[in-house]
């Protein structure tokens, strides 16, 4: 199938390069812009979280793995397989570019399909890639095949695991156009924020990335008619607290790809300690195997493959590395520019390079992702003589093999940074460290070539970062320190300028590497980076040198920054009515608990935090909140609270009112003002119960009339007896207005607005529709208004006091007052109200509760509305408007 796909893509590309996605139902145009023939994202489904990166990685890794299906050499195999595969397809395809593109498209399609059909596609790709890789390069293909299989499996595993562990991550997109052999590097840093909490990358996210790239380079890129142009796009995803594995699994392919071909290489930065063991380790193992394909890291094809691969790879990469090396030299700027991402991807490539023993120069610069690898790569260069420096000559093949093995080990130690092969790497990196130090030191001069130097400097930078960041990593640290020591010469080797450039890019890679190393080696390393809040700017290209020193700190800071960002975003989200209900619920539970704790006596009113209120009333604009002035709220409360307040309470309330009257908030009719503390306790209990219940039931206090009323009808009466139990709810200090509907007739039962007069509680806890609401009196206006009429008689007396206090709500007050005076009158108007009054008194006794429940269920909404209209038209209208507003 893979062969057919490749052929199909070949024809598509050669027959006229058409950008369309094969298996992408959900692909976006922008995505397709980036991935011309590839399905960039196979639908941003949760499994696709990193699938975009995974997909890209898979394109690299899987396609390369498919191309070079192997267990240990995903990158190597991708590189070799692709490299060879591309060569094979070069032979097959009219043009190597077309072939490469075709191969890329094939890989893309494979990845797409693979992405959609991870297993079957992987197998098919694996087979196809294996065949191709095998055909292209027996040794590389074989080793690659092994690596590719692992990589594919790894990718699959990673993809499988990633949905669980995938986090939006920082995407560093290095786009390089190769015009002639000159790369035109561009770097983009995309920070994706998981604002919706699903932790998945959406097509829009990728589309934005693609759009950015397209806008940056799309218009400037001219693709020959029926020809192909290679756009090397490396998409690296900073690991979610996991090492960034460079799964662009093709150094050789990359080189081959350097030929016109669209490469979208995404590093699988999610080195799953779990799934990545397969994927990351496989890439790493693949790198190790690839790099050490003979390096006996896996001991499988290690030595033979290494010799063969190194020889072949050296030769091939000397071939390609020559032309790639030239490309890489020509594209060294590109590599350097995109070196960070590429280095990350090329970390795998370097692994490949190591296993290939190939071009440190071309891949070396791209080794940035794995500066250690780069150092190792350079080590390979030294031992491998660059795989002869640029793969240009096998300077020291025997030493290269030996050093290469040692370097492989070192690289494995690097992989330890990159992956969980810590044991082998630990074992190996000790010996390898020495070798790699030596080889790195030697290879640095060998790779003193600008590209390699920059790579080396990059490696040094990353090594520093890794060493700094990886220092916690015992395994990585020795190799890192060793590499660091060696690498330090590299940057000092006159690579400093490039090192700075790369360092900028490498900083991210080094950060990632260091972070990965730390994460890998430490629990701190395990500390996932805030998934959605990875800030690409932390990896600013500036502070390149500072990054080396800061890399370690950044490893720590990045999480802190992300956490801060998360908090900031969360706050903004809350402000934007994107309240986190779990938090709100927690708050409510806390409040309820506190209320329960203090229920025995009227708790001291406690103001609810504005944050709580905002969460509860996410929709209220500041204007609305302000508009609902406390005076208005107090007016409503004044009208309403008397209704709820029993006459005994009225007396207390009068006292409270008198107190309240002196209070600036005269209007606050809150029963709390008027109501004696015992009444407050009643209502507090009611409120606390309702709130606790609401906290659980309706985290988002929805204040629509219907919902509130419905809730109220359910919970109206509930806490009247409870007030004895949980006056502590009042402790929330919000003058509590139980608006709600203990009884449908009194849906707007006003819980005592406990101390609006007191002043401690500016917040009113409204119980509307049995939904206790902690809110400012202004916010509670609507609910309070509705509850006014529910307690006409009680409020009548209260209102008398309140009216004395307030004239502003005179009409309403009179209206309520009227209801209060002839409680029977208001009751006849609303039989429910009648019941409500009967219940109001019993309701505090708890009898009203059952009644309100029954009536609530029966007439809940209609009764409430009717009652409200009859008793508080203006209030009702306000309520009607305000709840809608709120």
Curated annotation (Swiss-Prot):
Composition-biased stretches (Low complexity): 62-79, 93-112, 823-832, 846-861
GO biological process: negative regulation of canonical Wnt signaling pathway; negative regulation of Wnt signaling pathway; Wnt signaling pathway
Region entry Required for nuclear localization and inhibition of Wnt signaling, spans: 554-583
Top-level taxon in the UniProt lineage: Eukaryota
GO cellular component terms given for this protein: cytoplasm; nucleus; plasma membrane
Compositional bias of kind Gly residues: 132-145
Molecular function, one GO term: calcium ion binding
Subcellular location: Cell membrane; Cytoplasm; Nucleus
Domain EF-hand: residue ranges: 181-216
PROSITE patterns reported for this sequence: EF_HAND_2 (PS50222)
Basic residues composition-biased segments: 80-92, 319-328
Keyword terms: Cell membrane, Cytoplasm, Developmental protein, Membrane, Metal-binding, Nucleus, Wnt signaling pathway
Region (Disordered): 62-149, 267-286, 307-338, 789-861
Transmembrane region(s): none
Similarity section: Belongs to the NKD family.
PANTHER family named among the record's database cross-references: PROTEIN NAKED CUTICLE
Function as written in the Swiss-Prot or TrEMBL entry: Cell autonomous antagonist of the canonical Wnt signaling pathway. May activate a second Wnt signaling pathway that controls planar cell polarity. Required for neuroblast specification.
Record protein name field: Protein naked cuticle homolog
